[in-house]
């Protein structure tokens, strides 16, 4: 299976650089799993697409203002993007500089924030932030929201709110679980009144989510690792949903990765509590265990996220839906429109299993 199989042409003007004025005011492309038919709807139509007894699973990670600009103490500009907090004062980060800083190098960022490079781990640098103030607090006060590279603009004050879900609570992500950005409080309340249940997992999205697949044969791709937690409460909610005949509906690909990781080694449809790192790579041929339906944004050509969606709803159907979305001028990527997909039971031309 080749990376080029997941290519599609996307005009630059279809990349959303700003969010819609209202979170839930966006388009929703619906793909029928049985017929492959495509319907063009609004996101608020979820009120009719979801049934009482269904379970929506959200990722409650909170995006850190993880980008800082500054310089080395010896001179020379440097840009930092935190990848993962290690403790209250240390973190793993990407550094962009004309010359990679060595261990012992002091960095001075905006707001007189000082950090020292303690070690290098492949492409990541281990930083220790100086002083008594915790690293996360320093970033909240002086950091910039880490907008994806394809948004191609500086972050603005409004991004502090809009590049964050309304239910975000556990700090640790450096990219938003973007399918959840469409849910506002009125829509969530209306769904609850309809009898739709809601549960939460946590996956701290790393900057690796934007790394391209560099190999031609996607089976040779090594997926980046991200930390997640699926707790006992969510496991009980999934079991109860199965018992009443409802659907487990993942809000975003990060929720999919949580649920499918927690389902490894379990009977079909069941999950167990899980806390730790996952590098699960889902592409066509994957044997689904837990997720019945998916709400997701439109993803980059040749990306692992597009491969996951193709595994879920069928490669030919998804690629045809993407071509239709381009023709109908849907907005793409993090601040763009969304899709609603049911899991396809049909076979597809790529029978190989994925690996975890």
From Swiss-Prot:
Looking at its record, which EC class is this enzyme? transferase
Q: Which UniProt keywords apply?
A: Cytoplasm, Queuosine biosynthesis, S-adenosyl-L-methionine, Transferase
Localization of this protein: Cytoplasm
The organism's superkingdom is given as Bacteria
**Pathway in which this enzyme or protein is active:** tRNA modification; tRNA-queuosine biosynthesis
| GO cellular component terms given for this protein | cytoplasm
Instruction: Output this protein's name.
Output: S-adenosylmethionine:tRNA ribosyltransferase-isomerase
What organism is the protein native to? Chromohalobacter salexigens (strain ATCC BAA-138 / DSM 3043 / CIP 106854 / NCIMB 13768 / 1H11)
